[in-house]
């Protein structure tokens, strides 16, 4: 997490997900800062995160979901709020496959991605 420039950097599974940059949406920035200050890290072990998520969801009466479901939600919100499809793929760490134009020549800045992610409207 880069707090100075407000973005996440990560991904370890595939070439396209490694070192990907995802801006921190302004609506979640306070939660990110608070969690980092309290715990010193954003997320701990996946198993612990999953178990904590299950307990929290059950406590507020929401059916069980996995952490991976958050990726589906993010992707759906990108579609709903007209985030550029190529930028949605970049932020999710998806490959451009045979799309040579975007794979080789598609360069986007942090600010470009920030403009796109801020299209997602979050209720207060």
Regions found by a protein language model. Give the residues of each.
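Catalytic-site neighborhood detector that most strongly recognizes the C-terminal catalytic loop/helix
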Residues: 13-16, 92-123
């Amino acid at each position: 997490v880069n707090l100075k420039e407000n973005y996440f950097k990560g991904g370890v599974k595939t070439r396209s997900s490694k070192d990907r940059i995802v801006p921190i949406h302004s609506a979640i920035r306070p939660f990110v800062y608070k969690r980092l200050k309290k715990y010193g890290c954003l997320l701990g072990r996946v198993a612990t995160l999953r178990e904590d998520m299950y307990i929290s969801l059950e406590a507020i009466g929401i059916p069980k979901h996995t952490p991976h479901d958050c990726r589906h939600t993010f992707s759906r919100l990108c579609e709903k709020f007209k985030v550029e499809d190529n930028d949605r793929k970049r932020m999710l760490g998806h490959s451009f496959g045979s799309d040579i134009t975007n794979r080789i020549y598609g360069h986007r800045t942090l600010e470009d991605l920030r403009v796109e992610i801020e299209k997602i409207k979050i209720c207060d």
